[in-house]
Amino acid sequence: MANKQDLIAKVAEATELTKKDSAAAVDTVFSSIEGFLSKGEKVQLIGFGNFEVRERAARKGRNPQTGAEIKIAASKVPAFKAGKALKDAVK
């Protein structure tokens, strides 16, 4: 499984940037996506995929310890849908 450090190393290798500059670039991409999503905007990366905020409706759940029914409030969750190029690359 690759992690953030692996991604930073790949960016540094591909761009000949230092790892410090690559880390800043990767952090900027992640924080930018987070910023757009927090404003309710969709981030579309053609071929790679779409990041968006989806609304989850209020629903009933159960407390696993007591079995009592509880109300779970509506919430917003981040979502990602892979694009065609990414899906094809994984096949």
UniProtKB/Swiss-Prot annotation:
CDD domains named in the record: HU
Statement: the UniProt record of this protein carries the keyword Secreted: no
Record keywords: DNA condensation, DNA-binding, Virulence
Any one cellular-component term (Gene Ontology): cytosol
Pfam family, one: Bac_DNA_binding
Keyword DNA-binding appears in the UniProt entry: yes
Gene Ontology MF: a single term: DNA binding
InterPro entries for the chain: Hist_DNA-bd, Histone-like_DNA-bd_CS, IHF-like_DNA-bd_dom_sf
One GO process term, biological-process aspect: chromosome condensation
Family: Belongs to the bacterial histone-like protein family.
Role according to the record: Histone-like DNA-binding protein which is capable of wrapping DNA to stabilize it, and thus to prevent its denaturation under extreme environmental conditions. Also seems to act as a fortuitous virulence factor in delayed sequelae by binding to heparan sulfate-proteoglycans in the extracellular matrix of target organs and acting as a nidus for in situ immune complex formation.
Protein name: DNA-binding protein HU
Species of the source: Streptococcus downei (Streptococcus sobrinus)
